[in-house]
């Protein structure tokens, strides 16, 4: 893609990845405008948030390359949309992914409404790539070629972030560019150190994008409080303790249980009776699933039927992820009356309702979309 005649907005987070994005664009003779999206809490004295340091880093990098930086306050929209989604899901016993929805609703959504609509392209530091092609279509007997843009994986399987982008809309993907998506993380670090970027040695952020050092359970507790209930051993029906709220636990969880006689892992939640079921390992298969349904499938570029052609009797050949890991699991995808059924090539630990199952082609190259797991 020729970028020379494009108006480009760069989303700077204060981290090394988006900073190298700016360097890469400036190196090509471009002068994009930079934006820092404010989504963190306002109560700085109550929340141990790193947003102030993030903004300082973003400011320093933008000034280094002579680009203007504008702070875009998306705080209210984040808490109205992403936080509400998260709390509704966890209260219902599901396992949501706030970062997936942040990309769709905030970084490529609200930002576009406020500023991004003035730009041809929006550049971010995501580890992802894109491909463009044209397909022939006929409308009202007129034939034409329609351009398509595919979301594709990064060559760095550990850092690949296509799973976090699998819910964005096609029009959002059309405007997105990922200038470091073809690089390995080590290469990005080397560029940052060579260019003496202020955040070259800064650690990567972990967990939900704005929380910083805030504990996720404290974030949940702020909105939902605590609701104690029984913890029951699945195999024996024996009560082994109490939990402080089902929303503090996820299916497949092994750590941080706080019960004696372990190890334990969470296998089921009864939201109506407020019971947490755990297994001591008598029947470890209770924590594994090989087939599971997904609903509300969101296709990125084309409907799945067009990606694969006619449905096969054995289902569509795919690879998939249910969490942010380097592994792409082979399987098949079978259309059903109200969604799809995923058949995994092997049993998977910790399949939980509310998780996004991200679907890729059989070579785990193109990301085709994602759906929410239902059990």
Name what the model sees in each region.
Residues 1-166, 193, 266:
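ATP-dependent adenylation/nucleotidyltransferase module used to activate substrates
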């Amino acid at each position: 893609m020729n970028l020379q005649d494009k108006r480009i907005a760069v989303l700077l987070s204060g981290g090394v990845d988006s900073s190298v994005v700016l360097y890469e664009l400036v190196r090509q003779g471009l002068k994009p405008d930079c934006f820092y999206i404010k989504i963190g809490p306002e109560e700085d004295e109550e929340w141990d948030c790193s947003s102030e340091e993030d903004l300082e880093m973003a400011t320093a990098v933008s000034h280094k390359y002579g680009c203007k930086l504008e702070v875009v306050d998306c705080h209210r929209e984040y808490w109205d949309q992403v936080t509400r989604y998260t709390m509704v899901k966890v209260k219902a016993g599901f396992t949501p992914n706030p970062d997936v929805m942040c990309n769709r609703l905030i970084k490529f959504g609200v930002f576009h409404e406020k500023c991004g609509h003035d730009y041809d392209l929006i550049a971010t530091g995501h580890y992802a790539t894109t491909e463009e092609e044209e397909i022939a279509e006929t409308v009202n007997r007129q034939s034409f070629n329609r351009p398509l843009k595919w979301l594709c994986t990064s060559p760095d399987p550990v850092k690949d972030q296509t799973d976090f982008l699998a819910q964005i809309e096609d029009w959002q993907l059309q405007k997105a560019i990922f200038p470091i998506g073809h690089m390995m993380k080590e290469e990005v670090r080397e560029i940052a150190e060579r260019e003496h970027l202020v955040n070259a040695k800064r650690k990567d952020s972990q967990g939900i994008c704005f929380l910083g050092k805030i504990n996720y359970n404290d974030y949940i507790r702020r909105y939902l409080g605590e609701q104690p209930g029984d913890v029951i051993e699945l195999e024996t029906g024996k009560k082994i303790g109490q939990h402080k709220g089902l929303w503090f636990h996820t299916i497949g969880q092994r750590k941080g249980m706080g019960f004696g006689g372990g190890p334990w892992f969470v296998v089921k939640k009864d939201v109506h009776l407020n019971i947490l079921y755990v297994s001591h390992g008598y029947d470890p298969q209770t924590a594994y699933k090989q087939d599971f349904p997904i609903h509300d499938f969101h296709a990125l570029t084309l409907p799945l039927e067009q990606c694969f052609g006619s449905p096969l009797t054995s289902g569509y050949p795919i690879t998939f992820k249910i969490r942010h890991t380097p592994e792409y699991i082979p399987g098949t995808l079978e259309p059903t009356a109200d969604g799809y059924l995923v058949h995994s090539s092997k049993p998977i630990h910790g399949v939980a309702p509310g998780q996004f199952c991200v679907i890729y082609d059989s070579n785990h190259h193109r990301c085709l979309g994602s759906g929410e797991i239902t059990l």
